[in-house]
From Swiss-Prot:
TM ranges: 17-37, 54-74, 94-114, 135-155, 190-210, 239-259, 269-289
Gene3D superfamilies: Rhodopsin 7-helix transmembrane proteins (1.20.1070.10)
Gene encoding the protein: Tas2r117
Record-linked SUPFAM superfamilies: Family A G protein-coupled receptor-like
One Pfam family in the UniProt entry: TAS2R
Topological domains, Cytoplasmic: 38-53, 115-134, 211-238, 290-318
Positions in the Extracellular compartment: 1-16, 75-93, 156-189, 260-268
Protein name: Taste receptor type 2 member 117
CDD domains per record: 7tm_TAS2R14-like
Disulphide connectivity of cysteines: none
Annotated source species: Rattus norvegicus (Rat)
Length: 318
């Protein structure tokens, strides 16, 4: 019985590890492709639109985030003794920065879609709609205030943790950190995650309301077909729904770690949470690629080129 349980554990652990590293690699490739397409378009046109600026910055921030997580996992799994107080402090600070821009740039993308596509006669909405670039800029500047506060609180918590550890050094700091400090870090993390989530959810609900209002107006004038505005609403809603779904999984993975903290001692549970956590920055990039005609065409061009190259090279090898 114990042998069977051990076998199941080993298989589950190996499967989750493969899934996790596959997510990381595919996420880096997807975000790298997105950044490359927009940068090449920028160089060719000598200008870049606001939405492409957001998408490029989002892709770059996620590449850094996924690379950082990849390196952290390799060190954690292969060289746990290298996890010192200094390394954890540096890793936490880097993680706060890249994760902050990942979340807030995605939120700004949702705000951009909402202001560009929604139709409201409210004077405040119209004022913001005509100043969408300033709205995005102000949102990012306000988010920097939250980043500073988040960084200060996290560093304060880490310093307290280090001081307590140095008073009683009985085992490695990595073990002490995960046993005594990691839960507080996760709690702070979820507090700062809630702000952009509420903003994204609000834009989603307002988009639905705008679509409903527009649909009623169109039913009075046009029967049996969808106009360009309705299609734009549906396209934006599909993107925002996918974003909110992945974002919800992202937040739930953190909440589960806080509520069931005793399970963090089990490597299998940690891996499962990491798989859920990484799904957001990895898969969201592919949703954005599929939702953008220019990136979708570029992706198809690459696939056709690979197919042609394979068919062309193979006869030469013979």
């Amino acid at each position: 019985m114990q042998h069977n349980l051990k076998t199941i554990f080993v298989i589950s652990h190996s499967t989750l590890t493969i899934i996790l590293f596959t997510e990381l690699v595919t996420g880096i490739i997807g975000n790298g492709f997105m950044a490359l397409v927009h940068c090449m378009d920028w160089l060719r046109r000598k200008k870049i639109s606001l939405v492409n600026q957001i998408l490029t910055a989002l892709a770059i921030s996620r590449i850094f985030q996924l690379c950082l997580l990849f390196i952290s996992l390799v060190i954690s799994f292969s060289y746990p003794d290298l996890t010192t107080t200094s390394l954890i402090k540096v890793t936490c600070n880097l993680w706060i920065i890249v994760n902050h821009f990942n979340i807030w740039l995605a939120t700004c993308l949702g705000i951009f879609y909402f202001l560009k596509i929604s139709n409201f006669s409210n004077s405040l909405f119209l004022y913001l709609k005509w100043r969408v670039e300033k709205v995005v800029l102000v949102t990012l500047l306000v988010s920097l205030v939250l980043l500073t506060l988040n960084s200060l609180l996290i560093n304060l918590e880490i310093n307290i943790c280090i001081n307590e550890y140095q008073r009683n050094i009985t085992y490695s700091f990595n073990s002490y950190y995960h046993a005594n400090c990691h839960r507080q870090m996760l709690s702070l993390h979820i507090i700062f995650l809630s702000v952009p989530f509420v903003l994204s959810l609000s834009t989603f609900l307002l988009l639905i309301f705008s679509l409903g209002t527009h649909h009623k107006k169109m039913q009075q004038h046009v029967q049996g077909r969808r106009d360009a505005s309705t299609m734009a609403h549906f396209k934006a809603l599909q993107t925002v729904i996918a974003f909110l779904l992945l974002y919800s999984i992202f937040i739930l993975s953190v909440l589960v770690q806080i509520w069931k903290y005793e399970l963090l001692k089990k490597n299998l549970f940690i891996l499962f949470c990491q798989v859920a956590y990484v799904a957001f920055p990895s898969f969201h990039s592919y949703i954005l690629i599929l939702g953008d005609m220019k990136m979708r065409q570029a992706c198809l061009s690459v696939l056709w080129w690979q197919k042609f190259r394979k068919n062309y090279v193979e006869p030469l090898d013979l």
